[in-house]
Curated annotation (Swiss-Prot):
Keyword Glycosyltransferase in record: no
Compartments where located: Membrane; Late endosome
Protein encoded by which gene: SMIM22
GO biological process, one term: regulation of cell cycle
Pfam families the UniProt entry points to: SMIM5_18_22 (PF15831)
Chain coiled-coil ranges: none
Protein name per the record: Small integral membrane protein 22
Taxonomy of the source species: Eukaryota, Metazoa, Chordata, Craniata, Vertebrata
């Protein structure tokens, strides 16, 4: 699938023409879709930054100390079996 040099030059000229005219998108929908995409990417990057900050800053170097839990009996006493 070879691309001819004429097609490549036409594409380059089209891109350069859009850059010179400051018309990057063809329609309003293209602009809206790009803004939604940037918002999504910003949200994902913010969440990743928060996860990294939580992992790096909030973890203690020593082992965790958990309070000893009381032993609870499992199950239910069947009072009908008692004399």
């Amino acid at each position: 699938m070879a691309v001819s040099t004429e097609e490549l030059e036409a594409t380059v000229q089209e891109v350069l023409g859009r850059l010179k005219s400051h018309q990057f998108f063809q329609s309003t929908w293209d602009t809206v879709a790009f803004i939604v995409f940037l918002t999504f990417m910003g949200t994902v990057l913010l969440l990743l930054l928060l996860v990294v900050a939580h992992c790096c800053c909030c973890s203690s170097p020593g082992p965790r100390r958990e309070s000893p839990r009381k032993e609870r009996p499992k199950g239910v006493d069947n009072l009908a079996l008692e004399p």
